[in-house]
């Protein structure tokens, strides 16, 4: 009997087993589409970024002008640029939803997959931050100055590290050059990490909405889930294209339409909207080093979740109190994003501090509330 090429060919067989004939649980919901959406977002970012890099000049005298040139003179350059900028926002929306899904349904129990996913999140955040610096507008320059300056909080060696990162005594041409280099290289490292992430995921198989072993009830990924993924592909592309064609600069900062000027500080320095929750956590700690630690912890705290003692059920589906806590945390993250945009004055300072405490409390108390619920069920 002749086997099809996808099963015979050694190279195509690998792709086939991880995409076409992959056994997937029958009951996975739309929340499981986010992984493929993230893959699509990454491809959009790499392709649009590649075309942008053909026309961009990483020099402080010409960077701003080269971005203007892309938007005005390059064929469809305005579209490529807005797709790249707004594509990053879509990427982060999908990523935060993906992480939220993992927390809610207990996917963090797959330790290797969860850890590589958290590393990918860090890498993408670093890539996005460096990309924000490249247009060399006011917010690009001052954002880079403020965020890189946080490294000076490291005891003893902080100042030396900052000057090493800057390549001088201030954010200058050397900084822009190295940020451009890393912004170009990091997405390919992210791609490699995604391959490892998928490798670990396919070792265990996907989780599902009820958190039970689904080995007895699986179907091939194609055609069932490929068509299902296509629906969300189309929805995401429609949202992205509508955003780019109707209000392309809605999510940007007006200060970035002004070329970088080291002598004029913007009234309110802030990062892109998808970093505002972490920025609010940073600002809510009065001490500089404490703020930096809280900033890093706001993401790295995800890494403690696989070490939770196992509860009777996987995920929050069967824990009403944990569901309430989860949705409170979602609201808290939205409020922190809002606080990050506000000036540093009362009542925003106190509000930010209270929200920061609630945010970290979720990760500390979540497992204990679930254990308490287990005890109630037992009795």
Curated annotation (Swiss-Prot):
It comes from Locusta migratoria (Migratory locust). Heme b b566 binds at residues 98, 197. Heme b b562 binds at residues 84, 183. This is Cytochrome b. Component of the ubiquinol-cytochrome c reductase complex (complex III or cytochrome b-c1 complex) that is part of the mitochondrial respiratory chain. The b-c1 complex mediates electron transfer from ubiquinol to cytochrome c. Contributes to the generation of a proton gradient across the mitochondrial membrane that is then used for ATP synthesis. GO terms for cellular component: mitochondrial inner membrane; respiratory chain complex III. It comes from the Eukaryota. Keywords: Electron transport, Heme, Iron, Membrane, Metal-binding, Mitochondrion, Mitochondrion inner membrane, Respiratory chain, Transmembrane, Transmembrane helix, Transport, Ubiquinone. The main subunits of complex b-c1 are: cytochrome b, cytochrome c1 and the Rieske protein. Its cofactor is heme b. Gene3D superfamilies: Cytochrome Bc1 Complex, Chain C. It is found in: Mitochondrion inner membrane. GO terms for molecular function: metal ion binding; ubiquinol-cytochrome-c reductase activity.
């Amino acid at each position: 009997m002749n086997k099809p090429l996808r099963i015979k060919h050694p190279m195509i067989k690998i792709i086939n087993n991880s995409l076409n004939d992959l056994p997937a649980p029958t009951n996975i919901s739309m929340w499981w589409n986010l992984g493929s959406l993230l893959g699509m977002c990454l491809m959009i970012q790499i392709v649009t970024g590649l075309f942008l890099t053909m026309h961009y000049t990483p020099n402080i005298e010409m960077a701003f002008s080269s971005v203007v040139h892309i938007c005005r003179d390059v064929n469809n350059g305005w579209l490529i640029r807005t797709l790249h900028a707004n594509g990053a926002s879509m990427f982060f929306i999908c990523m935060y939803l993906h992480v939220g899904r993992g927390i809610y349904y207990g996917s963090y129990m797959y330790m290797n997959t969860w850890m590589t996913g958290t590393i990918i999140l860090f890498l993408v955040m670093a890539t996005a931050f460096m990309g924000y610096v490249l247009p060399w507008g006011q917010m690009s320059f001052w954002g880079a100055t403020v965020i890189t300056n946080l490294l000076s909080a490291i005891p003893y060696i902080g100042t030396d590290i900052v000057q090493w990162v800057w390549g001088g005594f201030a954010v200058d041409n050397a900084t822009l050059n190295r940020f451009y280099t890393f912004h170009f290289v990091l997405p390919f490292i992210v791609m490699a990490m995604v391959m490892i992430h998928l490798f670990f995921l396919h070792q265990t198989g996907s989780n599902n909405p009820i958190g039970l072993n689904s080995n007895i009830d699986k179907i091939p990924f194609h055609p069932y889930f490929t068509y299902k993924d296509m629906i969300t592909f189309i929805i995401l592309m429609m949202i992205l294209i509508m955003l780019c064609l109707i209000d392309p600069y809605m999510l940007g900062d007006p200060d970035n339409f002004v070329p970088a000027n080291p002598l004029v500080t913007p009234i309110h320095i802030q990062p892109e909207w998808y970093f505002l929750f972490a920025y609010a956590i940073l600002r809510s700690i009065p001490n500089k080093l404490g703020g930096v630690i809280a900033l890093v912890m706001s993401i790295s705290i995800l890494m403690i979740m696989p070490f939770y003692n196992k509860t009777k059920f996987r995920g929050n589906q069967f824990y009403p109190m944990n569901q309430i806590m989860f949705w409170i945390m979602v609201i808290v993250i939205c409020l922190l994003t809002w606080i990050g945009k506000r000036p540093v004055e009362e009542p925003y300072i106190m509000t930010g501090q209270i929200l920061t405490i609630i945010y970290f409390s979720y990760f500390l108390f979540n497992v204990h509330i679930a254990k308490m619920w287990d005890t109630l069920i037992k009795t």
